[in-house]
From Swiss-Prot:
The keyword Nucleotidyltransferase applies. Keywords: DNA replication, DNA-binding, DNA-directed DNA polymerase, Mitochondrion, Nucleotidyltransferase, Plasmid, Transferase. It comes from Neurospora intermedia. GO terms for cellular component: mitochondrion. The keyword Transferase applies. Belongs to the DNA polymerase type-B family. This is Probable DNA polymerase. This DNA polymerase requires a protein as a primer. The name 'Kalilo' originates from Hawai and means 'fatal disease' (because of the senescence induced by the plasmid). Its main location: mitochondrion. One of its GO terms (biological process) is DNA replication.
């Protein structure tokens, strides 16, 4: 159940801008947070005993804890693991097993909290298994909270310590394979080399490079074993013995002496390994203050010493660059090789109803199954009806209709394949051939299906794609945008879900209330009456109308895709069907038409993970909960504005460490803060009315972005630091990464913005240009960590688990298993990503919004990424609906109420002069009366809302419907 306390949280955090000392007890800053970890051994004398059931048709099983833990601690896992081992020994003879830990939260969501481990019943191995499954998550609460879907919508966490509530599940499979070994059986005694050091006789030998100690002075008389030669023009330091394991080696220095600098060649056992250049930075007599440049493999590292202490360090980060696309795509528009597919489902009640802990939360009352599948190839449409009891077999037969030689290489599009249709389809396809999903963040972006035909060994391929990922709007809207000849129909879905009505129903047209958009402007009573008049003779046929509706969907989607494909190709010479998402398509267009070579660095995972700490979303804050005559303004294309008018990070990154003064001094910068990203200690001015610099907080519901007062440490973009300095923020610089500055998006944005500005709002190009403009920036910030997905047999799955690390497994209802294995870093080094670009664009956007936040501080009620609500007219020079970055006036609320970010509403006049209500409530899809929202302003008032939500379950190839309760306090 979602809880939202406006008075206890929002007023304190958003309006009073709590300092660190006054923050609620459950909120801790990342760098200050600490937790007392539970002891390794449980103090419990009684081991819990859950129960074991088969997980699927495979040999995998699930152990379910009987106890619901509040909270789940390390001891909880220890106790349940003991109970599991005890039960396992009674039921299975195999000593070893594959093992994965999960949590079933109180909303019935299930999340894996470990990868697949290989365990055994040996007592020591059990303790090691416990360490493996709890070390990551019990020590960092955010790890668990981030594994929870929509954590803010459910009361999953105990507010006291941030640990989750719920039951424990162990998914496991016994194995007697002698080649399967636990992680600890693989370990052998490894000889450890001692650190490589020079003799410690000289107290100045403090500086180390790659384990080699080098004197941190230009006073050569302090170097070990020094000898001057060639009348003092050169010096040598020979045969300095160092130790490495049992063997001794010698380190030597050959030095060329100049008036202002020394050049040094370093040799290990008489083999040159790197070069040094020491340069004086103070007076000629000051030999303890100097700049040292070490060159190895054509890479330089710079160290600066003052009075013998290192005060600055820098080095270039090895990097490649994002490359242009040079290939030419060819499309035969007479045969674009596209198939469209649509499923219709029917929900049936579950008896007994699956309920949450309190009888309400997470309540699951029905399950969906496919009842119809329609397929369209551009010429013909076929439909297949399914029965509830045999839909899997019937769907297999339906798919055989497109498993044909002539469809080899075709793209099969379904609108919402990733989150809905694919749940039913994936396991079915795995029974017919080889299935290779491409997934990111749990979302199926593309599915490759290889199959063979009878009496043939040749493999054929179909690619299943999600059209919603490339055209993210309803099919109804898309049909209008692209001026389809065939438009989406209306259908009474609620009537279909009434299980008292047979599928062969023929009779009166279903009532208006059964249609999903009833009582809205999208489907008026007049439109319904026009539809119902077609069936005056009570000849409305459920089966016939369902088939017609589904077939029209496939035809409408096909027409949209072909139109989109043609328009993109004619403008950019790119085949859009090669790209699974709209960001990937926008990125391809940019790389093909506008990218300059050797400009944008391809940032790998280690540096990505650091700079990503500076990547925040927009400012979203509530300041005043109620007002009258409140005007709403939105920035015209905020992110494209930032991309066009501001410099972006480019070139080779340079790591720097030191104070800001030394960073400026030793990089020869003319900037107050050199361009790049910095790890800094932040101190806010305590009198700042509306803070705007973000940071991340660990809360019981996971990591959250906040804009507080106080002190903390974090990574930020240089331009955001400069903007904050103007308003009194203070920064202590620790380290950073410097970049060159480049303009790179001007032409891309100019082209698309001009298209948008000159196109009618309901035209295809208005929609396309807006989509491409706003979709590019996020593509640069993709997570570089990849995963490889396998859907295979149990036997092959066991082999994969035994040979790969970081594996998770999902047994499927067919008996096959879905395995996800994290790819090693070197396997995804060419993903063409550059998170500095995304971070900079987001920062520039916050800087732009901070201008309005500070200028209209006394008048602002609410800010949300690219929009504000104020009780004053903005200056005229700041408002222009046609110019990038300017504000555009939306409407005025006669009366306005907000309960928090993404939760607001009010009364306003429409274009016809009629007073209407507008309410926006994150996470709630139904219509909420404004008066209900307004009741949330009353202290101690409780507002409870209920709506149905899908719960996808890939392991069962189904989707559940559950009642979700949102509670506003």
């Amino acid at each position: 159940m979602s809880k939202f306390s406006f008075f206890n949280y929002r007023i304190n955090m958003r309006n009073s801008h709590a300092t660190l000392g006054s923050l609620p007890c459950f909120i801790k800053f990342n760098y200050l947070s600490s937790s007392s970890h539970s002891k390794f051994y449980s103090t419990s004398t009684d081991s819990p005993m859950g129960h074991i059931v088969s997980a699927s048709k495979s040999s995998w099983y699930n152990y379910y804890s009987h106890k619901n833990y509040d909270p789940l601690t390390r001891e909880s896992f220890h106790d349940e693991l003991r109970g599991f081992i005890s039960l396992y020994k009674k039921q299975f003879k195999e000593e070893k097993f594959f093992f994965m830990a999960k949590i079933k939260f109180n909303n019935n969501d299930i999340r894996s909290i470990s990868t697949v481990q290989i365990g055994s019943t040996d007592p020591l191995e059990v303790l090691r298994l416990l360490e493996a499954i709890t070390s990551t998550y019990m020590h960092t609460h955010t790890g668990i909270s981030e594994a929870v879907s929509e954590p803010f919508e459910y009361e999953l966490f105990s507010l006291g310590d941030g640990l989750p509530k719920g039951n424990i599940i162990f998914t496991f499979k016994p194995t007697s394979n002698p080649s399967i070994k636990t992680k600890y059986e693989h370990k052998s005694n490894i000889k450890r080399n001692k650190n490589i050091n020079l003799s410690k006789k000289n107290p100045l030998n403090k500086f180390k490079y790659n384990g080699y100690t080098i004197p941190n002075t230009m006073d050569l008389s302090q170097w070990p074993n020094i000898h001057f030669i060639n009348d003092g023009k050169n010096a040598v330091s020979l045969n300095n013995i160092i130790k490495s394991g049992v063997d001794n080696m010698t380190l030597s220095f050959f030095i060329t002496i100049n008036k202002k600098y020394n050049e040094i060649t370093v040799l290990l056992n008489n083999t040159p390994i790197f070069k040094i250049k020491d340069e004086k930075i103070m007076s000629e007599d000051d030999l303890s203050s100097f700049k040292r440049t070490i060159t190895e493999n054509e890479q330089d590292k710079v160290y600066v010493f003052e009075n013998g202490e290192m005060v600055f360090f820098s080095e270039n980060v090895k990097t490649s660059f994002i490359k242009k696309i040079t290939r030419q795509d060819l499309i035969n528009f007479e045969n674009p090789k596209i198939i469209t597919l649509d499923l219709e489902t029917r929900s049936v009640p579950i008896h007994p109803i699956k309920e949450g802990k309190d009888g309400k939360e997470g309540k699951v009352d029905s399950i969906m199954f496919p009842i119809l599948m329609s397929v369209y190839n551009g010429k013909f449409v076929k439909s297949f009806l399914f029965s509830q009891s045999a839909w899997e077999t019937e769907m297999m037969n339906a798919f055989k209709s497109i498993m044909l030689r002539k469809y080899d290489g075709y793209k099969v599009y379904t609108h919402n394949f990733s989150y809905f249709d694919g749940i039913f389809i994936i396991d079915i396809l795995s029974r017919l051939g080889e299935v290779k999903p491409f997934m990111r963040n749990g979302k199926i972006l593309k599915l490759t299906f290889n199959f063979t035909l009878p009496n043939s060994k040749r493999k054929y391929t179909l690619y299943f794609m999600d059209s919603l990922l490339i055209l993210p709007d309803s099919l109804d809207k898309l049909s209008n945008f692209f001026n389809n000849k065939v438009k989406k129909l209306f259908f009474p879905h609620s009537f279909l879900d009434d299980n008292t009505i047979p599928i062969n129903y023929v009779g009166k047209c279903p009532d208006y209330k059964y249609f999903p958009k009833a009582y809205t402007e999208d489907f008026t009573i007049e439109q319904y009456q026009e539809y119902a008049n077609k069936f005056k003779n009570n000849n409305w046929d459920l089966k016939k109308e369902l088939i017609k509706y589904c077939e029209i969907d496939t035809i409408a989607l096909y027409q949209v895709l072909v139109s989109f494909q043609r328009k993109i190709y004619e403008k950019f010479m790119i085949d859009c069907t090669k790209y699974p998402t709209i960001p990937s398509l926008a990125f391809a267009i940019f790389r093909k038409k506008y990218l300059v070579e050797d400009m944008i660095p391809n940032i790998k995972s280690k540096l990505h993970n650091i700079i990503k700490l500076s990547y925040f979303g927009g400012i979203c804050e509530l300041y005043k909960p109620f007002g009258v005559n409140i005007k709403s303004y939105d920035v015209n294309s905020l992110y494209p504005f930032a991309m066009k008018y501001f410099k972006m990070p480019s070139g080779i990154p340079k790591y720097v460490k030191g104070t800001l003064q030394n960073i400026v001094r030793f990089t020869d910068s003319i900037c107050e803060v050199p361009f790049g990203f910095y790890n800094v200690k932040v101190k806010t001015p305590l009198n700042l009315d509306k803070p705007f610099l973000p940071t991340r907080l660990n809360t019981p519901a996971g990591t959250r972005t906040a804009f507080p007062l106080g002190q903390w440490e974090g990574w930020y973009f240089s331009e955001e630091i400069l903007n904050a300095m103007k308003h009194g923020y203070e920064f202590e610089f620790i380290e950073g990464y410097l970049f060159e500055e480049s303009s790179m998006f001007d032409e891309y944005i100019d082209l698309l913005y001009n298209i948008k500005k000159n196109s009618p709002k309901e035209s295809p190009w208005y929609y396309i240009s807006k989509l491409l403009m706003n979709s590019l920036y996020g593509r640069f910030g993709l997570n570089p960590e990849g995963e490889e997905i396998f859907i295979t047999s149990e036997e092959e799955g066991d082999a994969i688990i035994a040979t790969k690390e970081y594996v998770t497994i999902t047994p499927l209802s067919s008996g096959n298993v879905l395995i996800s294995a994290k790819l090693p870093e070197e396997a995804f080094g060419d993903m063409n990503i550059s998170v500095p670009i995304s971070s900079a664009i987001a920062a520039y956007s916050r800087i732009h919004m901070s201008h309005f936040l500070t200028k209209y501080s006394n008048n602002i009620y609410y800010i949300d990424t690219d929009g504000i609500k104020v009780d004053i007219d903005l200056d005229k020079d700041e408002v222009d609906s046609k110019e990038l970055g300017k504000m555009k006036y939306e409407y005025v609320f006669e009366e306005y109420t907000s309960l928090g970010p993404k939760v607001y509403g009010g009364l306003l006049y429409d274009k016809k002069g009629k007073l209407i209500e507008l309410v926006k409530l994150r996470g709630y899809s139904s219509k909420l009366p404004y008066n209900k929202l307004k009741e949330g302003l009353v202290k101690d008032h409780t507002l409870e809302l209920t709506q149905k939500k899908w719960k996808r379950k890939l392991s069962e190839s189904t989707v559940y419907l559950k009642n979700t309760h949102l509670l506003f306090l």
